[in-house]
């Protein structure tokens, strides 16, 4: 008897392409492993034998193989319509079982991975009849009826670890193999395949061009289902080598296309990763999944490239991931995290006025370089028609927002917050609410372009994950971790609106700069973040390099501090991130007890608002912004779309309710005024 094998079931309806997929998957796995392959069609007892065949398969094939023993089974003679000879399937390091019912309920306890193969009904019928000819045609309907009956009682589709759309392009075997590597149950045995994927080579080109970023993004990724633009839209306003200029030096444009492209969505403990035609689902905490994929494929940065992003994951983390960092479990209307893996990207270096094209070496890399090079050239000297196409006019009908909390309700919650503070349950509570509207005919792309023009910011971003769109003009860095372990947080606490009158604007800035209340709020969050970073920092490395500085943006003045630290060598970076998440500037202090209070006070989940947007690079670097000043466009499940804009402010013992309410109106103004909308009365 040999050790128990890893058993992979390839299931799906007749004609879905299971046999071809299983054979080609086995061929790929045989490069590093001994593989046995079993086809259920060899054991079904006739055209009416689906359920008896599954029973035979489980009892005579799967049970012995699962314990490392040879399986002796009786085949079916399809021409003579009775049992054929005795056959033996030997155990191996990996066993693939394929056919309708391969992952049936009785089989699943003995399986390590379940792959469900999907294909449209017409394609399945054509494929099956092409394979089996006139022999199968009279039985197609009766066999399909047996499948229907089985699937009506067996939740095999929902139980699948991987679901694959078996396309005609032949991509399914490679996509499934890549998806299998995400499954803890088979990842260990696939270490040779994982090692091969980790030996990645980064190719690059440097172009001395200054393209129009919006036109370039639209040209390369305007039709991509998933795409991300991390947009330092205020770069022209902060030239030089100051901290503000450093934050605004790079913009990153990417999608999940190409050989290495993937996307990941996380909801309430389940992570779904799509690689081409295959989607793999794994249960467990998001930050544990992130730890398994972030910084595991070190690549060397190109010579002369100063950026920290060397390809990797980009997207957002939602506020409700706090369930993994000490907060309560609150369901969100949007995925708790959405990321794409960019195996190729365009990086704009605004300081050096250059463009970097980055791509992992792959068969399709050269073609992408040609396309990207041409797009950069076209966006550097665009004609008027190209600009008109990429930069549309009106965003759409002006939306009418409502608020989850009326002015009276919000002010009452301010009083409730101050009661919690007086009871000693918190020092500072970052109370928020959400403005909501029907999206109507609003164009998210046009809206974002208007937002970035009117409210340029170092951490602006445009994210598209299918129908979900995020348009952010955030000025606030949550957390940066450099590839060498340097950490930095830059919380914002304290806001004043700008004035068009220079003297009045200067007075507003001075008022913020000298406000004892705002300084107290800011210093409390600085202290919280010092603690958050210290959990994984080298002792003594946590410093405050800037305290309560004032930065001015298009519509607001902000009070900003900077906390620096250095990550302990070997410390898990995803855990260091989790220790600081969500941003203390969006919770208050102390963090965990204050999050509990906020769950009681606030009228619904925050969703993407208060979370983080940014990247997780292959070289283990990350740079994340706090999700504020951000418009979210989300499908409502009925064919429509909703808009949401989160706003809030820090409540302390000496907060004045009217002033706090005016502050959230000020924070909302930049986004609402761009849309032509008003703050709800």
Regions found by a protein language model. Name each.
Residues 185-681:
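Extended alpha-helical targeting/anchoring segments
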Residues 18:
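Conserved lysine of the Walker
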Residues 1, 109, 113, 130, ...:
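NTP-dependent small-molecule kinase module
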């Amino acid at each position: 008897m040999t050790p128990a094998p890893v058993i992979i079931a390839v299931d799906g309806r007749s004609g879905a392409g299971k046999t071809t997929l299983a054979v080609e998957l086995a061929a790929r796995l045989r490069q590093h492993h001994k593989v046995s392959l079993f086809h259920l069609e060899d054991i079904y007892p006739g055209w009416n034998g689906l359920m008896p065949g599954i029973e035979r398969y489980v009892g005579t094939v799967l049970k012995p193989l699962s314990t490392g023993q040879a399986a002796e089974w009786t085949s079916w003679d399809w021409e003579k319509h009775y049992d054929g000879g005795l056959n033996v399937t030997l155990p191996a390091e990996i066993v693939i079982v394929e056919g309708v019912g391969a992952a049936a309920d009785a089989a699943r306890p003995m399986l390590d991975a379940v792959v469900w193969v999907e294909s449209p009904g017409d394609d399945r019928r054509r494929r099956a009849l092409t394979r089996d000819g006139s022999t199968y045609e009279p039985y197609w309907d009766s066999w399909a009826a047996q499948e229907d009956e089985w699937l009506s009682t067996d939740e095999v589709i929902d139980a699948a670890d991987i679901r694959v759309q078996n396309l005609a392009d032949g991509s399914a075997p490679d996509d499934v193999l890549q998806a299998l590597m995400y499954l803890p149950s088979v990842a260990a045995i696939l270490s040779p395949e994982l090692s091969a994927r980790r030996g990645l080579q980064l190719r690059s080109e440097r172009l001395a061009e200054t393209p129009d970023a919006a036109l370039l993004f639209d040209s390369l990724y305007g039709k991509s289902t998933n795409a991300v633009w991390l947009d330092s839209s205020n770069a022209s306003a902060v030239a030089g080598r100051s901290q503000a200029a450093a934050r605004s030096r790079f913009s990153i444009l990417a999608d999940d296309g190409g050989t290495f492209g993937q996307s990941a969505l996380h909801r309430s403990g389940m992570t779904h990763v799509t690689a081409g035609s295959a989607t793999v689902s794994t249960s467990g905490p998001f930050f544990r999944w992130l730890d398994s994929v972030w910084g595991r494929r070190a690549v060397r940065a190109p010579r002369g490239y100063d950026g920290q992003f060397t390809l990797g994951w980009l997207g957002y983390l939602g506020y409700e991931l706090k369930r993994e960092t000490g907060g309560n479990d609150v369901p969100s209307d949007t995925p708790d995290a959405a990321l794409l893996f960019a195996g190729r990207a365009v990086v704009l270096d605004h300081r050096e006025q250059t463009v970097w094209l980055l791509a992992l070496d792959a068969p399709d890399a050269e073609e992408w370089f040609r396309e990207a090079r041409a797009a950069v050239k076209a966006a550097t000297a665009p004609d008027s028609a190209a600009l008109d196409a990429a930069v549309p006019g009106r965003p759409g009908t002006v939306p009418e927002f409502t608020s989850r909390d009326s002015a009276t309700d919000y002010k009452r919650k301010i009083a409730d917050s101050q009661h919690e503070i007086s009871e000693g349950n918190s020092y500072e509570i970052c109370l928020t609410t959400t403005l909501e509207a029907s999206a109507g005919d609003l164009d998210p792309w046009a809206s974002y372009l208007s937002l970035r023009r009117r409210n340029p910011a170092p951490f602006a971003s445009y994210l598209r994950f299918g129908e979900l769109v995020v348009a952010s003009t955030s000025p606030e860095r949550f957390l940066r971790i450099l590839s060498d372990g340097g950490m930095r947080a830059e919380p914002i606490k304290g806001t004043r609106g700008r004035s068009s009158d220079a003297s009045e604007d200067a007075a507003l800035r001075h008022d913020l700069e000298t406000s004892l209340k705002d300084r107290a709020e800011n210093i409390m969050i600085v202290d919280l973040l010092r603690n958050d970073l210290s959990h994984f920092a080298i002792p003594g490395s946590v410093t405050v390099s800037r305290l309560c500085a004032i930065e001015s943006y298009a519509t607001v003045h902000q009070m900003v501090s900077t906390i620096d630290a250095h990550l302990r060598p070997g410390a898990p970076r995803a855990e260091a991130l989790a220790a600081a998440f969500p941003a203390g500037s969006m919770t208050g202090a102390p963090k965990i007890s204050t999050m509990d209070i906020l769950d009681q006070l606030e009228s619904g989940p925050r969703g993407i608002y208060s979370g983080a947007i940014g990247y997780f690079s292959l070289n283990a670097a990350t740079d994340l912004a706090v999700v504020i000043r951000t418009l979210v466009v989300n499908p409502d499940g009925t064919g429509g779309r909703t808009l949401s804009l989160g706003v809030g402010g820090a409540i302390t013992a000496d907060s004045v309710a009217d002033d706090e309410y005016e502050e959230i109106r000020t924070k909302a103004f930049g986004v609402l005024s761009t849309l032509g909308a008003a703050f709800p009365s």
